[in-house]
């Protein structure tokens, strides 16, 4: 896994956890949880690709991995839309920078997950 992506995830999660968005703090906590889940999923796919030929192990561990992959892409799309919405409504420059970086990271991770999944198919 790219060390820059790891530090980007950690940096964005740390900054998002410090943000105070008033009544929408539950939504933000949900976004943080989904970011963490997405990172773990991306890492596990990356590890499977690194071990090439580990497709059978992945399928045995999770017989519905294609369905799970589709769900992760739906989560990514939802997160992208949510981050874009937050970016439009916030006036705080710290939050704008954080959400812009989160959006960039989501697009990068979506591309990486697509690449990993094509290698596993």
From Swiss-Prot:
Interacts with protein M1. May interact with host nucleoporin RAB/HRB and exportin XPO1/CRM1. GO terms for cellular component: host cell nucleus; virion component. Keywords: Host nucleus, Host-virus interaction, Transport, Virion. It is found in: Virion; Host nucleus. Average number present in a viral particle is estimated to be 130-200 molecules. Belongs to the influenza viruses NEP family. Signal peptide: none annotated. A motif (Nuclear export signal) lies at residues 12-21, 85-94. GO terms for biological process: exit of virus from host cell nucleus through nuclear pore. It holds the Pfam family Flu_NS2. It comes from the Viruses. Mediates the nuclear export of encapsidated genomic RNAs (ribonucleoproteins, RNPs). Acts as an adapter between viral RNPs complexes and the nuclear export machinery of the cell. Possesses no intrinsic RNA-binding activity, but includes a C-terminal M1-binding domain. This domain is believed to allow recognition of RNPs bound to the protein M1. This is Nuclear export protein. InterPro entries: Flu_NS2. It comes from Influenza A virus (strain A/USA:Phila/1935 H1N1). Its main location: virion.
């Amino acid at each position: 896994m790219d060390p820059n992506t790891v530090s980007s995830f950690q940096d964005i999660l740390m900054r998002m956890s410090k943000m105070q968005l008033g009544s929408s703090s539950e939504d933000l906590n949900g976004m943080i949880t989904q970011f963490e889940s997405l990172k773990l999923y991306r890492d596990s796919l990356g590890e499977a690709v690194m071990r090439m030929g580990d497709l059978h192990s992945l399928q045995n561990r999770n017989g519905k991995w294609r369905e799970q992959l589709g769900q992760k892409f739906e989560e990514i799309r939802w997160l992208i839309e949510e981050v874009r919405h937050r970016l439009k409504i916030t006036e705080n420059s710290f939050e704008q920078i954080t959400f812009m970086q989160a959006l960039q990271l989501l697009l990068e991770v979506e591309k990486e997950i697509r690449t990993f999944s094509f290698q596993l198919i």
